[in-house]
């Protein structure tokens, strides 16, 4: 398994989870874990995804998710899980 973290933040609206998930599914990316919440109309979601069978590299996936985020009016960030592992060592 090769893991990445997808973070989404913005004003709550219909279709955010569907839009982000559709980009992931299109590229054969599996959602391993997901947490989402809405606080005072602010939507927040973090996904752990398996990119090992993806048909694009993480850079292309990031670009497409960011573009989908713009369409949805939310901010999307994508990081390889190793970034967080290295941060814990500092």
UniProtKB/Swiss-Prot annotation:
Belongs to the UPF0237 family. NCBIfam families: PRK00194.1. SUPFAM superfamilies: ACT-like. GO terms for biological process: DNA-templated transcription. The lineage of its organism: Archaea, Thermoproteota, Thermoprotei, Thermoproteales, Thermoproteaceae. CDD domains: ACT_1ZPV. It holds the Pfam family ACT_6. It comes from Pyrobaculum aerophilum (strain ATCC 51768 / DSM 7523 / JCM 9630 / CIP 104966 / NBRC 100827 / IM2). InterPro entries: ACT-like_dom_sf (IPR045865), ACT_dom (IPR002912), UPF0237/GcvR_regulator (IPR050990), UPF0237_ACT (IPR022986). Disulfide bonds: none annotated. GO terms for cellular component: cytosol. Signal peptide: none annotated. This is UPF0237 protein PAE3582. Residues 5-74 form the ACT domain.
